[in-house]
Amino acid sequence: MLGKSQFDDLFEKMSRKVAGHTSRRGFIGRVGTAVAGVALVPLLPVDRRGRVSRANAAESAGDPRGKWKPQDNDVQSCDYWRHCSIDGNICDCSGGSLTSCPPGTKLASSSWVASCYNPTDKQSYLISYRDCCGANVSGRCACLNTEGELPVYRPEFGNDIIWCFGAEDDAMTYHCTISPIVGKAS
């Protein structure tokens, strides 16, 4: 076993050897590269196709949402497949449609997105939820669906935010939400 002084001598010799063969700038550059690389990890693409099968397979007795099955018949129903992540009122019940606001309301320029599964063609689609603003809440067809919802620190996937701050003419009062298809998600 090495004594204390032998250990100190060995460590000092190795430290001096490493210091003699490397520069401070090189070390700082490598640390900077590592920090930048770690910061860029959240920007990498992620394959979430497995989430659809897990979401549809979830059958929880304590969770009423566990039995939620998307359907493709009644667009004014909360379980219509495009409404998988809607948190608000469906515009189709207020004189609008899946893609247009009711008369007297303005379309907000901001949106949030979700990937919803269509049971008819067994495909997932990217839905861009946009709020219609400028009239009082209709109260008809109110839905609280949270399929694929993420916490508020990812606001582009957050359905708890009222997105009327981008509407024309300062129409800040929420009325309903439309759900147009952006494209295929998978």
Curated annotation (Swiss-Prot):
Post-translational modification: Predicted to be exported by the Tat system. The position of the signal peptide cleavage has been experimentally proven.
GO MF: aliphatic amine dehydrogenase activity; methylamine dehydrogenase (amicyanin) activity
Keyword annotations: Disulfide bond, Electron transport, Oxidoreductase, Periplasm, Signal, Transport, TTQ
The enzyme's E.C. designation: 1.4.9.1
Enzyme class: oxidoreductase
Compartments where located: Periplasm
Cofactor note: Uses a protein-derived tryptophan tryptophylquinone (TTQ) cofactor.
Disulfide pattern: C78-C143, C84-C116, C91-C176, C93-C141, C101-C132, C133-C164
GO biological process per UniProt: amine metabolic process
Residue(s) of cross-link: Tryptophan tryptophylquinone (Trp-Trp): W112-W163
GO cellular component term of the entry, any: outer membrane-bounded periplasmic space
Pfam family, one: Me-amine-dh_L
Biological or metabolic pathway of the protein: One-carbon metabolism; methylamine degradation; formaldehyde from methylamine: step 1/1
Cofactor(s) the protein requires to work: tryptophan tryptophylquinone residue
Its biological purpose: Methylamine dehydrogenase carries out the oxidation of methylamine. Electrons are passed from methylamine dehydrogenase to amicyanin.
Complex formation: Heterotetramer of two light and two heavy chains.
Protein name, entry field: Methylamine dehydrogenase light chain
Gene symbol of the encoding locus: mauA
